Amino acid sequence: TPKKSGSLVLNCLNCGALYEYQYETDCHKKGQRMSELSRLKPDPIPTIHPIPEYAADAALTAIYERTKSGFGVPWMGVVAMAFAHYREFYNCLWQAMEPVVVTQAFADACQKLRFAAEKEAASLSPVAICSKLTKLGYDDREIEEIKNCNEVFSSGNMPYVLMATLARLLLEEHSWDGKGSAQTHDAPSITFKRPVLIELHHADPNTTALFTDIRQTLGLPFVNTDYRAFARWPSYFNPAWTDLRSIILREEYEHAVLRVHEAAVLLAGSLPNMSKITPQQLIGCATQDGQLSEVLSVVRLFQWLLPGLAVNVAVFRRQLV
């Protein structure tokens, strides 16, 4: 099978450095390269059945703790909890990922993916809102708390994006032949506490209406953890969402998200396959959980929405500069 190679240049907003990511992927057996994995929203949107941490049995709780520790995050993303409904599938996927998340290649991929999201967010020119927050009475300490909450997701979403992307690649029968370095490093420390979340039954009518608008604007039947965390500060989140909503409705927004999707596909495909998992192995485990088409539809849903979520959180971050 012929090889394809190229490079993706990502601009680091925070440090001004320029990163060049060299990738190499095999052609798919049907002629589709990993780098050409389309951005695909399933239709109809599948019903998800996330297993929250409090409802997990002992075995699943252990996997959840290893997931959070491996990713260096203080919360289980909805994506992982939805995948965990398909127990054999998630066990197989995590067993393949666990030795990868401690590699330098994985840490670098997360960093580069974040830089890609932040570059796209900057190109969308979000409105700065710190002066508005100050006029509302927010002091520097409170604004810093919002920034810290954002940092949880700005950094923590990236492992979940890569996990969903790898899951889709394998379920769609792409070989995982990444050439990234298998050199290991210490697992990332969890530096932030799990954010306080505003659940639907906590929300007053205004916040309930905001959550409804988020679902309708994004075309999703649920509200991601990130938005429920930011809703802790309603007078901040209302103007932040209003600006983001106007950005989402612009044509260039989808182009920006597509570029982050493409970066995720390239970066995920470059990771070293430490366990040598094959598409057939993950497909076999997913089949044990029921209909393969159902599992694939759920995986496609999250692999579609997470690049957009990464851009949205980066927009929120840019608003606070």
Predicted regions and their residues:
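Accessible peptide chain termini
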Residues: 1-3, 34
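Short beta-strand element of the conserved SAM-dependent methyltransferase core
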Residues: 10-12, 316
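Hydrophobic alpha-helical segments
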Residues: 31-321
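Cys/His-rich microdomains that often coordinate metals
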Residues: 19
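Cysteine-centered motifs
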Residues: 12-15, 27
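Serine residues within intrinsically disordered or low-complexity segments
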Residues: 5-7
